[in-house]
């Protein structure tokens, strides 16, 4: 299939530039992937669409401070996005501006050196005057909100661009399907017999890289580290046996569970399943682990839109997106949600 098949017109005013005043005070579009029928609800009423015995799987990753501004010796400003969290002598970073090998950048009294240009707007950096590039970013960088918000990070983003269950640092972007979730709603779901299971996938480089190929088959997917605890796998098996549904809270959870599907089915150990998800899910894919997906409204031509289309059915999703635009739903990270089942 062509990447252009997943283009659509998204009016600028439909992109939520800020989070709602109250977390979770958003709308919910409910799509039946078998019939294409649509219902409109409030996110706070999610429990009406999940049932006793269902299992909601959440991503406990935490967004790290990864966005830093530096200045070249010429005075030109360079924006950097850290792509690795290790504390080795060099780190990869996405950059905005013009760089060449050997350039020296000043940031908060320290010099960053461009050791190598790795392609696709990525540079390998070292630093002088501090123990590591990672340490410089952790001391001085800010939370990397998405570029399509077209603004600098503000105080509100420090809280609201993290999920309420963020625990394990490592992501350069939030698992945005979780941004609307609240402790109160999780408690309502629990009282209704919906269990919660945890896992971690660190959102990485691919979130910021566009698809540059004409066909999906040519696209090489990025890798993202994940860890699925043994208890979560046990809960998945228990849910299957009892006839409940495995509900993925977001595309990050979906990628991890589907990448590990074969190992989950055969699992009998006590250690977590770890891996690097490089699976590119698009229409034609046969889902093995999840039964429902709670997600955002995604950007045109994005890999997460293609994953959602694979689960919902491309025609059903196109129709639902058209209706969402017409009914003035808010799109992207800080926007409304949809439940597909």
Swiss-Prot record:
GO biological process, one term: tRNA wobble guanine modification
Keywords from the named record: Cytoplasm, Queuosine biosynthesis, S-adenosyl-L-methionine, Transferase
Main location: cytoplasm
Keyword Transferase listed: yes
InterPro entries: QueA, QueA_dom1, QueA_dom2, QueA_sf
Keyword Nucleotide-binding appears in the UniProt entry: no
One Pfam family linked to the record: Queuosine_synth
Assembly information from the UniProt record: Monomer.
Job description of the protein: Transfers and isomerizes the ribose moiety from AdoMet to the 7-aminomethyl group of 7-deazaguanine (preQ1-tRNA) to give epoxyqueuosine (oQ-tRNA).
Family: Belongs to the QueA family.
Record's protein name: S-adenosylmethionine:tRNA ribosyltransferase-isomerase
Source organism (scientific name): Chlorobium phaeovibrioides (strain DSM 265 / 1930)
